[in-house]
Amino acid sequence: MKSLTEHLWFETPHRRDYINITDTVEKLVRESGVQEGLCLVNAMHITASVYINDAEDGLLHDYDVWLEKLAPHAPTSQYEHNRTGEDNADAHMKRQIMGREVVVAITKGKLDLGPWEQIFYGEFDGRRRKRVLVKIIGE
């Protein structure tokens, strides 16, 4: 069995951001030499997410608006968590909604994604360095 483990690092200039990481993950799959297997892509921070969806700008905007309605950043005093000196309770909730990781099948040496599916890193409390784990296993 072959395996590859890599860490991707992100430091976004904005509090919230969505970064398409599909090409980077595909490159790692090629480097791994795995033809049939699985690829795990996992946000290693509790205010960031990895998810799969369409890479359409309107949809990314809609996510931002929808998530802010569900868990608004302000007023920060509305969250018990923020009474500890933090101001990011909303980011924890946004991550919970968007998910922690994705697992994608590798078939014939390529990510087995649907026609519009792309892998994204979602940042909900940016402006500091965070990592994403990519773990590829298979034959």
Regions found by a protein language model. Name each.
Residues M1-E139:
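Active-site histidine-anchored catalytic micro-motif
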